[in-house]
């Protein structure tokens, strides 16, 4: 049993919770996720199973897309709906569509963002949420992120009420905290705010419409069709350039054999396949020997090569 499962992560579970539950359903210990989603967030969570756990780092896409909702009128400790209320301020004026779109435009492009205290970012070897739970505030590192697209999905021309909510879609770089974007929107509009809803609709080439639920996975296990839920390792790595080696080279790859870059591939990672179209390893350019490739991740061992 191996491959990538595109899980539609439910609300209320951590990414680790999802891995733990899948281990029980699939009766497989070698399972890992490709990046954390907050408990309140639903949507695309690629999960690697079996030998596919070796490629998890290559499936952590640089670009993610989310659809969410920001609510103005109060902020929370966690910057989302799960936290305790920190500040309240009634929205005492009408906010126009033009105002909101102007703010979203200002937040599009390369910007700086400070991660929230309730996050897994490490400071001095300790995760920020550990400081937050202990009631400690520490200096947080500012990170540079890229917002590729920030679109207002709500079709209203004006927003009125003590608490105002509106929906958005954002495509952003890896490491972006969307709940912090919700706070930044509120700051620019002059009101405390938080992210009241969020779903990840895409992680790189993996889309929400292709994801399956825990219930669907369990149904496939019971029906004996569990293999149908997996994206193969080869398919998951199809975005990378491909080299094919002969049987003799395939035997040596497991021992870390260097390869000549005969195809003059310039991409940072190259997948290496045998003549049976099985991915053996992922290679990268050798830093000291131009024109040579060195193994970054070997996916087969002696036993697997004999299969």
UniProtKB/Swiss-Prot annotation:
InterPro entries noted in UniProt: PsdUridine_synth_cat_dom_sf (IPR020103), PsdUridine_synth_N (IPR002501), tRNA_psdUridine_synth_TruB (IPR014780), TruB_C (IPR032819)
Function: Responsible for synthesis of pseudouridine from uracil-55 in the psi GC loop of transfer RNAs.
SUPFAM superfamilies cross-referenced by the UniProt entry: Pseudouridine synthase
UniProt EC number: 5.4.99.25
Family: Belongs to the pseudouridine synthase TruB family. Type 1 subfamily.
Positions annotated as active site in the UniProt record: 38 (nucleophile)
Protein's organism: Bacillus cereus (strain ATCC 14579 / DSM 31 / CCUG 7414 / JCM 2152 / NBRC 15305 / NCIMB 9373 / NCTC 2599 / NRRL B-3711)
Single GO molecular function: tRNA pseudouridine(55) synthase activity
Keywords: Isomerase, tRNA processing
CDD domains: PseudoU_synth_EcTruB
HAMAP family: TruB_bact
PANTHER family in the cross-refs: PSEUDOURIDYLATE SYNTHASE TRUB1, TRNA-PSEUDOURIDINE SYNTHASE
Enzyme class: isomerase
Catalytic activity: uridine(55) in tRNA = pseudouridine(55) in tRNA
Gene name as annotated: truB
Protein name: tRNA pseudouridine synthase B
Top-level taxonomic group: Bacteria
One Pfam family here: TruB_C_2
NCBIfam families: TruB
GO process terms (BP): mRNA pseudouridine synthesis; tRNA modification; tRNA pseudouridine synthesis
């Amino acid at each position: 049993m191996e491959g990538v499962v595109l899980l539609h992560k439910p609300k209320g579970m951590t990414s680790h919770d999802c891995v733990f539950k899948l281990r029980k359903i699939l009766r497989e210990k070698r399972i890992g996720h490709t990046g954390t989603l907050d408990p309140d967030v639903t949507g695309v969570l690629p999960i690697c199973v079996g030998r596919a756990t070796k490629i998890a780092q290559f499936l952590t896409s640089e670009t993610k897309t989310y659809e969410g909702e920001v609510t103005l009128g109060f902020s929370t400790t966690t910057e989302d709906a799960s936290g305790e209320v920190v500040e309240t301020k009634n929205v005492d004026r009408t906010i126009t569509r033009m105002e909101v779109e102007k703010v979203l435009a200002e937040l599009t492009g390369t910007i700086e963002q400070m991660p929230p205290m309730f996050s897994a970012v490490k400071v001095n070897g300790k995760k920020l949420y550990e400081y937050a739970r202990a009631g400690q505030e520490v200096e947080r590192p500012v990170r540079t992120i890229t917002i590729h697209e920030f679109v207002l999905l709500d079709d209203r021309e004006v927003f009125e009420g003590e608490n105002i909510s509106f929906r958005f879609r954002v495509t952003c770089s890896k490491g972006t905290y969307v709940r912090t974007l919700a706070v930044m929107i509120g700051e620019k509009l002059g009101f405390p705010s938080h992210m009241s809803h969020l779903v990840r609709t895409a992680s790189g080439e993996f889309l929400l419409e292709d994801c399956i639920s825990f219930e669907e996975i369990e149904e496939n296990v019971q029906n004996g069709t569990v293999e149908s839920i997996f994206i193969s390792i080869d398919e998951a790595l199809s975005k990378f350039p491909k080299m094919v080696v002969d049987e003799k080279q395939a035997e040596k790859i497991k021992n870390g054999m260097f390869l000549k870059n005969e195809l003059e591939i310039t991409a940072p990672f190259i997948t290496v396949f045998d003549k049976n179209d099985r991915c053996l390893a992922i290679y990268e350019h050798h830093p000291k020997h131009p024109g040579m490739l060195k193994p970054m991740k070997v996916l087969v061992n002696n036993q697997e090569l004999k299969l």
